[in-house]
Amino acid sequence: MAKDEDNSSVHLLDLPWEDVLVPHILRNLPLRHILSLQRVSKPFQSLVHLYLANCRHFDSTQLGSQLPKSTFSELLRNNTVLQKLDLQSCCDWLTDKELLPVIGQNHHLIHINLNSCGQLTRQSLVAISLSCPHLQNICLGHCEWVDCLSLRSLVDHCKCLEAIDLTACRQLKDDTISYLVQKSTRLKSLSLAVNANISDIAVEETAKNCRDLEHLDLTGCLRVKNDSIRTLAEYCTKLKSLKVKHCHNVTESSLGNLRKREVVLDVEPPLQRALVLLQDVVGFGPFINLQI
């Protein structure tokens, strides 16, 4: 009986690693829990290394600030199959030295998030353009090192771009954005927010070239005016959301048609806006009887 009991006992690590444990168990665990398994035993450490070498998605936000610079390169050292790379929570320390080896050996990346990674240089974006021909979505928000030449390199080599976030990339001007949208006509989402260099020229080029555009963020683009918003409404019939807060030259005369089409806008209609201001100034309650 004791012999039968010994033969029937199955341990977790007895299951097939590549066919069962990695794709069906580890893939469903938070990254921080997977990394903690390394402390259990050497076999578990080997299992985690196998997972890291074969994982398709690496999301540093799952670790928060717990991912030290010293271990980042080690974690992805043997991975050549990444499709999604989110390094937003590495923004305080990530440099070209850490990023370039990962980019250089992963040619299947589709989604990259480098939001606020301010210590990188244009060299990283050029490397992405040369190594990631299938790239569809890239976030470069608050990466002020992004310049005209590096963005043109990205556009020239990455023909499948559908979403790009250029929030606060203040080196970019109308001519560069025009080049982007002329080459990347499949764009569905674009952010040009917080860039005073952007004017009607870039917005109109976007409207005329990116007919499938669904989401556009122009927050804080002070030079954008009603004319380009009207052009946007005319050409981008699939538009779902538009952000124009703090665009002081954009008024209801251009937003009205979009509002009728139920495009989500981040500014209230004039009457509602006036009531909110009146409530703040006079101290009225939330309900106002307009018949008084």
From Swiss-Prot:
PANTHER family: F-BOX_LRR-REPEAT PROTEIN 15, PARTNER OF PAIRED, ISOFORM B-RELATED. One of its GO terms (biological process) is G2/M transition of mitotic cell cycle. InterPro entries: F-box_dom, Leu-rich_rpt_Cys-con_subtyp, LRR_dom_sf. It comes from the Eukaryota. Substrate recognition component of a SCF (SKP1-CUL1-F-box protein) E3 ubiquitin-protein ligase complex which mediates the ubiquitination and subsequent proteasomal degradation of target proteins. Acts as a positive regulator of the BMP signaling pathway. Required for dorsal/ventral pattern formation. The gene is fbxl15. This is F-box/LRR-repeat protein 15. The lineage of its organism: Eukaryota, Metazoa, Chordata, Craniata, Vertebrata. Its main location: cytoplasm. The keyword Membrane does not apply. Keywords: Cytoplasm, Leucine-rich repeat, Repeat, Ubl conjugation pathway. Part of the SCF (SKP1-CUL1-F-box) E3 ubiquitin-protein ligase complex SCF(FBXL15). Pfam families: F-box.
